[in-house]
A protein has these predicted regions:
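Conserved C-terminal "switch" segment of AAA+ ATPases
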Residues: 1-84, 95-102
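C-terminal engagement/docking regions of AAA+ P-loop ATPases
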Residues: 63-158
């Protein structure tokens, strides 16, 4: 899984200065397309890599042979992949095209990217409900412990 710096590098391949950028975003960065694209990439990384209740996805209880059991929380960042990052940018591009066709400003914006992150997170919530503890062990790279339980976190778990 990419860390925040690696995620920003991956996003640099997908969210480039030559893409249509929201006019308000460009104005906020003095018309500098590179600075605008870099700022938008940071928006995505900050939304994905924040460690708070909004980004908490799963609570995993693992069995350990020596110490018993432990519980940890996985956040969006723990599940982020290059494919997810590309999908977020793609969703935001689609939203900007739809907005422009409807008479709006169009172009990539912080708001559209945050919405794309939220949509991708919801899609991951759907996946978490259909995956076994063994599948999660493979996904998160847990080989030294056995996953006893996986509990979905977020809006639907309260």
């Amino acid at each position: 899984r990419p860390d925040a710096a690696a995620a920003e590098e991956i996003l640099a391949r997908h969210l480039t200065a030559d893409l249509p950028l929201d006019p308000a975003e460009l104005t906020a960065h003095g018309g500098d397309r590179e600075a605008t694209a870099a700022s938008l990439r940071r928006v995505v990384v900050e939304a994905l890599y924040a460690r708070n209740e909004a980004t908490a996805v799963l609570e995993i209880t693992e069995a350990h042979t020596v110490s018993g059991a432990s519980t940890r929380v996985l956040h969006l960042a723990d599940l982020t992949s290059g494919a997810m990052l590309a999908a977020i940018v793609s969703r935001a591009k689609t939203a900007s095209i739809k907005d422009e066709l409807a008479g709006g400003a169009g172009g990539l914006s912080a708001a559209r990217l945050r919405l794309a992150v939220e949509t991708e997170a919801r899609q991951n919530e759907e996946i978490t409900g259909a995956t076994t503890p063994e599948g999660w062990a493979r996904l998160i790279g847990t080989r030294t412990s056995q996953i006893l339980s996986v509990r979905r976190l977020g809006k639907e778990s309260t």
